[in-house]
Amino acid sequence: MSTTAMWLLLAVVVVAIVFGSVLYKRTFTTKELALTGVMAALSLVAYLFFRVPFYGGSSFHLGNTFTALAALLLDGVSGGLAGAIGLALADILAGDPGYAITTFVLKFIIGITCGAVAHKAFKLRELDKHSSGYLVKVIMAAASGLLLNVFTDPFLGYFRNVYIFGQEYTVAQALTKIAGGVTFVNSVASTVCVVVLYLALRPALERAGLLPKGETN
């Protein structure tokens, strides 16, 4: 696929997801937009300047941390957009617009999943921070989307390599990426960071009135 076609496909993916997000969430407060922007910027910095590349296109980084963190602090749509925008932009700045297409989708999935588990299943915002099982629920919410990425990353990577890059790439190679463990290590490390940051930041952000109250999308 030509570079122009990659850019057009990326534009279509971005417009579709942003449009769907607006329809789903409908309103974003100024504070939510600001915090989402901060998380997107942190995702970009964490990936672009603090990553360790590996053979085969994999790399160790903590960019996904801020995708899941935004989802827990705000909601799934905000978290998904923070990671999708921040990390897709990081791919573009790194000269990989083809990767940015699948990155945008993958990070949005992480955010939506973490947000759904945190706010729909566990209703973290309504829980007492000192209640029994609170820490376990925070860990599970953070891990949900990040561990799902262990499987969605190679799956979408297969379609990217075959249909966007036109490479010789097999399902077996995609499964090898799972077995390689780099994405899993990323997910575990990011989960630990998310839990620590969430427990530290939530009380302060609540006192500052920067977090939404009640049930969220």
Q: What is each PLM-predicted segment?
A:
Residues 1-217:
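Loop-helix junctions at membrane interfaces
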